[in-house]
């Protein structure tokens, strides 16, 4: 079972990350936590690589890394990751492909959790992440951009859970709407 948790800003993503990790933990699923940042234009790519080198020398972070650092700290605080070393740093980022970077994690449970930084259009990048890594469930926040959520539900090829108005203190029941589609059969298997 593979779960993708899409996060945005720190303030809005805490409920999404919390619920997504509770679900992933209960299903003992491999989990990818992804942040999608803005893509830099091709004309600026050389300048950006020079700037990234300068940022590394000055120990400053690339855009989006602070959000991943927040997610990393959140995972540690909830004991989803138990690291031998306590520091998150930019040197743990590994370029994997054009618009995807992964944070190397070490320690207990880290083989089942990936922190990913992608750049580009949100829907396109999340769709690519789901297709490339065969995610069964995508967890997204229920923010104010309703059109984007509609598009994500429509175009992402996995089950989608939208987290909106989630309270850490309240217990919830889940309504699982199904029909006779292949996706519904998978959802029923997962729920059982």
Regions found by a protein language model. Give the residues of each.
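Small/aliphatic-rich secondary-structure junction motif
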Residues: 1-66, 70-72, 76, 80-83, ...
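Gly/Ser-rich helix-loop-strand patches that form or flank binding pockets
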Residues: 13, 17-19, 115-170
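Short alpha-helical interface elements
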Residues: 28, 45-49, 55-56, 89-96, ...
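Short hydrophobic/aromatic-rich motifs at helix boundaries and adjacent loops
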Residues: 40-45, 95-99, 160-162
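Short secondary-structure boundary/hinge segments and terminal tails
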Residues: 42, 93, 148, 170-171
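Acidic/glycine-enriched edge-of-secondary-structure segments
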Residues: 57, 109-113, 144-150, 175
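Structural beta-alpha unit
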Residues: 73-138, 144
């Amino acid at each position: 079972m593979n779960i993708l948790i899409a996060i945005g800003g720190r303030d809005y993503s805490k409920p999404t990350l919390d619920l997504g990790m509770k679900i992933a933990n209960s299903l003992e699923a491999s989990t990818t936590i992804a942040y999608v940042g803005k893509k830099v234009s091709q004309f600026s790519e050389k300048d950006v690589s020079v700037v990234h080198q300068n940022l590394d020398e000055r120990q400053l972070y690339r855009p989006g890394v602070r959000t991943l650092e927040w997610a990393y700290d959140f995972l540690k605080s909830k004991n989803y990751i138990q690291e031998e070393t306590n520091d998150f740093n930019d040197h743990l980022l590994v370029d994997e492909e054009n618009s995807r970077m992964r944070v190397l994690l070490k320690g207990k449970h880290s083989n089942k959790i990936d922190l990913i930084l992608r750049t580009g259009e949100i829907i396109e990048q999340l769709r690519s992440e789901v297709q490339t890594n065969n995610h069964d469930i995508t967890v997204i926040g229920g923010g104010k951009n309703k059109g984007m959520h509609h598009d994500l539900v429509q175009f992402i090829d996995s089950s989608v859970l939208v987290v909106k108005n989630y309270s850490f203190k309240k217990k919830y029941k889940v309504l699982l709407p199904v029909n006779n589609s292949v996706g519904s059969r998978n959802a029923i298997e997962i729920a059982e």
